[in-house]
């Protein structure tokens, strides 16, 4: 059996990746402008931190390694501003959010790299449907065994990350009824899911990878689209379930939450085997209902996810104070519990604007840090922002000759 070397990292270090939307500033549809944007940034100091993604309407922004989330936030703000300047120069805008509200997957162009071209050939339309946008959080760990223990310890909290970050309620012009529809695209791939319950240390992880290779099911760890997975070449555990938030501030708050939670799980016993029993149900509840979903704890108690999250924040606050991140966790807690997640904000924007292209425009403003635009959500009564299966209006911008759509087109009913 081939051994997989694990590069040791300092505990509690962290970094993030953000997959971002490139937006046409006139139609507010996606723009296949990644090549032009990357060329514009080729000589910029952060050029090596901006990467192409599977389709040409996406780019990925990678942080460096940090010990404290405030340092991460300072770097992300600098990179955001540099990215926006370059985007302005090539005539596009940038937005966060887990899915574009009205893009058509058929119009997406695959990026020109051997791996992306292979994925398109292998997975067909799924590769173009994979034009969705996530935040990955990396947490430093000292060894492979520590990485496996961390993955197992964090797994019961996957629903919390999903619900806190959810920002993909709309897809192809329809309110999906989900807070996070992005993960439905991820789950279509055959090696999506989670670490097998019987993988309890690095040796067993290596054995599992060897078995997948022997069966021709995977060539490398990159083929594992798990919710949380080890990243041995970085020396990290990678949390992969978060939608890309609408702002870098929320992205860094989530990183601070992950850092404190990682400390907590190293101090507590490993979750009971029953933790895996409700894994898929908890995952669905968080995607579908966000913070209002139900949650089954590892010991079998059923309660609202938001109530479990409140109790979790109480347990995390002493750790956050040790790490010097209390302010960031308080901000995440208060904003999420009082105003809801980004999915609710997007629905409140549509409630106010009645036009999906204008919602996308508000997403681009939020990404730039124009908080006066993003703050309007709190003014809309919660009871008036319920999800609906009715088709979304205000997508006339799609009905253009360029898009190949008949004028007057409306999205089909969801059901």
Curated annotation (Swiss-Prot):
Q: Which InterPro entries match?
A: GCL_type2/YbdK_subfam, GCS2, Gln_synth/guanido_kin_cat_dom, YbdK
Q: What is its EC number?
A: 6.3.2.2
The record's listing under HAMAP family reads: Glu_cys_ligase_2
An example GO biological process term is:
modified amino acid biosynthetic process
Q: Which UniProt keywords apply?
A: ATP-binding, Ligase, Nucleotide-binding
Give the reaction(s) catalysed: L-cysteine + L-glutamate + ATP = gamma-L-glutamyl-L-cysteine + ADP + phosphate + H(+)
Q: What is this protein called?
A: Putative glutamate--cysteine ligase 2
Q: What is the lineage of its organism?
A: Bacteria, Pseudomonadati, Pseudomonadota, Betaproteobacteria, Burkholderiales
Q: Which PANTHER family match?
A: GLUTAMATE--CYSTEINE LIGASE 2-RELATED (PTHR36510:SF1)
Keyword flag Membrane: no
Q: Which domain of life is it from?
A: Bacteria
Q: What does this protein do?
A: ATP-dependent carboxylate-amine ligase which exhibits weak glutamate--cysteine ligase activity.
**Molecular-function annotations in GO:** ATP binding; glutamate-cysteine ligase activity
The similarity annotation says: Belongs to the glutamate--cysteine ligase type 2 family. YbdK subfamily.
Asked whether the keyword Cytoplasm is assigned, the reply is no
What transmembrane ranges does the database entry give?
Answer: none
